[in-house]
């Protein structure tokens, strides 16, 4: 992927997020500093640590959206966690190190995807060979084994050879079968058998286990360890050729890639390019009246501190250093302020960005301008019913005005208010859409006032409905 400059990053963010220029600029600089650091000598690289960001602003103004879009802009491991999900060491719940384990897991998935793309041509070739064999099977003959051979195979399975199990049923290929396979291979190349069903054997997906999930929260990957030791159970599935091919390509790709290399690269990717977004960090600030719950909140801050400062976390893929991981924390800080965080943690987030509350003009832009704006989403949904939905400019202005007024009169939930209002406004259209014969519906200012006017006038209804 080509390296994007701070201006290019901001330009992409502008396609999805309205306003908040200061936050976009700070995030873009922090990301590009990653690239600058990698151009320096190794000794200097070790000295330069990321300048972590703390974003403060009301709910619904774009904090989470900025973080979410970062994952699509840079090919870097990215995880979003909520600070309220963590508990102090000694309490039941997720420990703070799990955010680093999640980051490495995401890096492994990204690296695996890259490696699978590299070997896909060869994996596709092998998958097609297997499809030919399944569509034109030969006569099977049982391979006789003595007890010693059976014992060796069993030990091989238990010691990790289960992924390379050999099929004890060998095939006898006659001239007739050979000709059939040539014919099938030719038809496969011409996509003539895509809808034909074929039965394949695939590894059974591991079942969810509440105990292993709890172990994972405690930092113990017991479920994965047991899955690696025990033989993989195979199940038969009957699928169309086009779907079976994709399943077989995945299985063949796993055989062709080197997972030790994937894990090593994933760890390096996490350490040098990883981004962890910690949301709701204001919710772990202790209040003025301290009780056991408040003490636990401050304990979570102290547990997060060494992770942000730089430490080594053990994962099932190997030890991971957090020295150069970029941390972005965010919170509404409605009942507290960033200076209420423990001083040590404040110092680890040197860049402070305040996001502004949204205005009526911002709401108008949010409705229309972003690449996948709310209005474009509803227009696309109704297009599936053959209906052309049109919003007049006056209607858009009225929707924005109502959203702004409701936010001012009740709880301010920012841009999220628009989704609630649009859902109520278009309720009848969405309900009757499939049965309508008209090809075009225009939403006017009068229609908006008719649908929402009574609710806006009644403050009690506004609180419950909008």
UniProtKB/Swiss-Prot annotation:
One of its GO terms (cellular component) is HslUV protease complex. Pfam families: AAA (PF00004), AAA_2 (PF07724), ClpB_D2-small (PF10431). It is found in: Cytoplasm. ATPase subunit of a proteasome-like degradation complex; this subunit has chaperone activity. The binding of ATP and its subsequent hydrolysis by HslU are essential for unfolding of protein substrates subsequently hydrolyzed by HslV. HslU recognizes the N-terminal part of its protein substrates and unfolds these before they are guided to HslV for hydrolysis. This is ATP-dependent protease ATPase subunit HslU. The gene is hslU. A double ring-shaped homohexamer of HslV is capped on each side by a ring-shaped HslU homohexamer. The assembly of the HslU/HslV complex is dependent on binding of ATP. It comes from the Bacteria. Keywords: ATP-binding, Chaperone, Cytoplasm, Nucleotide-binding. One of its GO terms (molecular function) is peptidase activity. One of its GO terms (biological process) is proteolysis involved in protein catabolic process. Belongs to the ClpX chaperone family. HslU subfamily. ATP binds at residues 18, 60-65, 279, 344, 416. Transmembrane segments: none annotated. Its main location: cytoplasm. It comes from Lactobacillus acidophilus (strain ATCC 700396 / NCK56 / N2 / NCFM). Gene3D superfamilies: 1.10.8.60, P-loop containing nucleotide triphosphate hydrolases (3.40.50.300).
